[in-house]
Amino acid sequence: LTCLNCPEVYCRRFQICRDGEKICFKKFDQRNLLGKRYRRGCAATCPEAKPREIVQCCSTDKCNR
């Protein structure tokens, strides 16, 4: 699996996930829409969202745009 892993809106950097990591995720804070920064990467399970945080998970190559 290959996931994007940079904070910019238009991300071009990616990483190859390790064994056991079968999910790509994207997290961002819903309060900061103008200066939106993302956390992206690979995970074994979908990370849990904190208050006011949006988490999106998927399981195909570079799906965490």
Swiss-Prot record:
Checking Gene3D superfamilies in the record gives:
CD59 (2.10.60.10)
State one molecular function term (GO): toxin activity
Cellular location of this protein? Secreted
- Write out the tissue specificity statement of the associated record: Expressed by the venom gland.
Q: Name one GO cellular component term.
A: extracellular region
Keyword Disulfide bond attached:
yes
A single Pfam family, by name? Toxin_cobra-type
**Which interval of the chain is the signal sequence?**
none
Disulfide bonding pattern of the chain: C3-C24, C6-C11, C17-C42, C46-C57, C58-C63
List keywords of the entry alphabetically: Disulfide bond, Secreted, Toxin
Which CDD domains does the UniProt record give?
TFP_snake_toxin
Q: Which domain of life is it from?
A: Eukaryota
Query: What does it do?
Result: Binds with low affinity to muscular (alpha-1-beta-1-delta-epsilon/CHRNA1-CHRNB1-CHRND-CHRNE) and very low affinity to neuronal (alpha-7/CHRNA7) nicotinic acetylcholine receptor (nAChR).
Q: What protein family does this chain belong to?
A: Belongs to the three-finger toxin family. Ancestral subfamily. Orphan group II sub-subfamily.
* Protein name (Swiss-Prot/TrEMBL): Weak neurotoxin 7
